[in-house]
């Protein structure tokens, strides 16, 4: 690239502590000894020594140290020699390295020799505006090296892209604006995250209070059940006691009656023994013998054996109940562990390890299609503002028009969401969807997602068991556990969704005519069968499940538009 000739340094003396070296005649610029000087130039020559002393005094001023650019300080004209009458500078000449007020700037505006000088806004200290190696004004910018250079430096940067300082500033200002916008966006995301965190904290307090109330109620019921069981056992024992005592008393009364009867029989036998008439004796004794009751009731009450069985039941039940109560906290802790339902443990129980070792991830559409899986929208989960068409392969947000779907526990009540009818479990799957309109979400979730709640954890972007990709009209965004991750992938109307269940991978690809572009990949811990999930947050959003036999269309100028 040819060197830039942005300025032609004139013969004016510099008012800096370290004046730049004069340019050589070969540069095409006049040297201090060539040409005739204008009245202003003569004045410059006559006052250069004093100006140099003034500049040295200014450079040594402690109040001005640490502010080389002069930001925030008033810049005065270097030609106004009377300190009491110095006027504010309106321009700085990078060629002369001098600040000028409106009056002393006029020669630069009327003198043809001075009109080629580069004028800028007033600068307090010119030392940082010239090249320390060549003592020449910095006049250009090297893009590869990202530094300001002078004309002499252009030879050292031969072959580099070199632009003027103004052009470089325009580029950097545009870049700065993009950086500012990006920072503002990130700041907004951070503020939104803080707001959501505060809302979540309130939700946690409410949720914990609700669970506490449930726990108090359940434990109250448990205590009442224990007291009731105790009362029932006591009543049961008392009834058994009364029955046993009643039985014993009945037997006792009968035995006492039998004792009285036997006393009478004893006396009768004594009487018959005294009969001397043999015929009378035989007749009376035989008659007595035929009427005698030789049976005796049992005097053993078997309640003790029954009580032993009852004691065993009570003891074992009490021990079991105590163990359950002691394991309450342990079970709660185990329930809260993420590793409790590690799918690898479940898979290894039915499939040998050597068969579920992860295979390499596909890279071409042909390779992805070997895991093709046909899914459809589940009408029993669709929100009433979502219309299903094309045999449940297309869904459209028709807000505010409702559809006469029956009220079901599985239907989403607040969020405009719908799940797939088919679950995804233990294998690899691949399907494609077309999205229309900003505000569409595509992802996975578990069957247990709350269908009736209005909190963020009821949508597929706001909990730790859902993973989703959002198209906001400008860019894609990944969502997990109410955390947003902006992505730099370009717009795609058709998305390929790849699930490696054993490997814990969920990937989204932009599908074009001849390429597959990775948009985002989630590392997941699947703990149960998952379902394809879709959220159409805005009116007229639409999502269509693609027949995988359809070849992708060639890229169009606007890939993600409105629903057809």
Curated annotation (Swiss-Prot):
Residues 24-39 have a biased composition (Low complexity). SMART domains: BBOX, PRY, SPRY. The modification Phosphoserine is found at residues 116, 203. One of its GO terms (molecular function) is interleukin-1 binding. Its main location: cytoplasm. Residues 355-553 form the B30.2/SPRY domain. Phosphorylated by ULK1. Auto-ubiquitinates via its B-Boxes. Zn(2+) binds at residues 131, 134, 153, 157. Homodimerizes via its coiled-coil domain. Heterodimerizes with MID1, TRIM24 and PML. Interacts with Galectin-3/LGALS3 in a ULK1-dependent manner; this interaction mediates autophagy of damage endomembranes. Interacts with BECN1. Interacts with ATG16L1. Interacts with p62/SQSTM and LC3B/MAP1LC3B. PANTHER family: B-BOX DOMAIN CONTAINING, TRIPARTITE MOTIF-CONTAINING PROTEIN 16-RELATED. Belongs to the TRIM/RBCC family. This is E3 ubiquitin-protein ligase TRIM16. It comes from Pongo abelii (Sumatran orangutan). The lineage of its organism: Eukaryota, Metazoa, Chordata, Craniata, Vertebrata. The gene is TRIM16.
């Amino acid at each position: 690239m040819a060197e830039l000739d942005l300025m032609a340094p004139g013969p004016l003396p510099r008012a800096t502590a370290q004046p730049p070296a004069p340019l050589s005649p070969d540069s095409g610029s006049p040297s201090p000894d060539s040409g005739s000087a204008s009245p202003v130039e003569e004045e410059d020559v006559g006052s250069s020594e004093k100006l140099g002393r003034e500049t040295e005094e200014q450079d040594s001023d402690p109040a001005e140290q640490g502010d080389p650019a002069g930001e925030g300080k008033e810049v005065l004209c270097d030609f106004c020699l009377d300190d009491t009458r110095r006027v504010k500078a309106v321009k700085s000449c990078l060629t002369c390295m001098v600040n000028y007020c409106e009056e002393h700037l006029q020669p630069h505006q009327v003198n043809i020799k001075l009109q080629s000088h580069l004028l800028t806004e007033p600068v307090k200290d010119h030392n940082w505006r010239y090249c320390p190696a060549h003592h020449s004004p910095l006049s250009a910018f090297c893009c590869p090296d990202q530094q300001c250079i002078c004309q002499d430096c252009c030879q050292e940067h031969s072959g580099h892209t070199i632009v003027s300082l103004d052009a470089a500033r325009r580029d950097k200002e545009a870049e700065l604006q993009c950086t500012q916008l990006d920072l503002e966006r990130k700041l907004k995301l951070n503020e939104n995250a803080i707001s959501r965190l505060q809302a979540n904290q309130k939700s946690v307090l409410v949720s914990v209070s609700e669970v506490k109330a449930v726990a108090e109620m359940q434990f109250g019921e448990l205590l009442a059940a224990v007291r009731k069981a105790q009362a029932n056992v006591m009543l049961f024992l008392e009834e058994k006691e009364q029955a046993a005592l009643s039985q014993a008393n009945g037997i006792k009364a009968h035995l006492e009656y039998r004792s009285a009867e036997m006393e009478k029989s004893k006396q009768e036998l004594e009487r018959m023994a005294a009969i001397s008439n043999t015929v009378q004796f035989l007749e009376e004794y035989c008659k007595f013998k035929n009427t005698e009751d030789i049976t005796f009731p049992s005097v053993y009450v078997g309640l003790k054996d029954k009580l032993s069985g009852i004691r065993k039941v009570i003891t074992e039940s009490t021990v079991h109940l105590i163990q359950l109560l002691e394991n309450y906290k342990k079970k709660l802790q185990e329930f809260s562990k993420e590793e409790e339902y590690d799918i690898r443990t479940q898979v290894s129980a039915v499939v040998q390890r050597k068969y579920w070792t992860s295979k390499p991830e596909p890279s071409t559409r042909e390779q992805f299609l070997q895991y093709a899986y046909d899914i459809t929208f589940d009408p029993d989960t669709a929100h009433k503002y979502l219309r299903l068409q094309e045999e449940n392969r297309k869904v459209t947000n028709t807000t505010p028009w409702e559809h006469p779907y029956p009220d079901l526990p599985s239907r989403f009540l607040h969020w405009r969401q719908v799940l797939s009818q088919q679950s995804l479990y233990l294998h690899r799957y691949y399907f494609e969807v077309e999205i229309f309109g900003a505000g569409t979400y595509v992802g996975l979730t578990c069957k247990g997602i709350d269908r009736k709640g209005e909190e963020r954890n009821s949508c597929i972007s706001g909990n730790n068991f859902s993973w989703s990709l959002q198209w906001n009209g400008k860019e894609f965004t990944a969502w997990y556990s109410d955390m947003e991750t902006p992505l730099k992938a370009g717009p795609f109307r058709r998305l390929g969704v790849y699930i490696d269940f054993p490997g814990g991978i969920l990937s989204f690809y932009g599908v074009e005519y001849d390429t597959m572009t990775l948009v985002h990949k989630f590392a997941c811990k699947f703990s149960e069968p998952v379902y394809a999930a879709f959220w159409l947050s805005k009116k007229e959003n639409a999502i269509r499940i693609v027949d995988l036999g359809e070849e992708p269309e060639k890229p169009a100028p606007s890939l993600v538009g409105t629903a057809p």
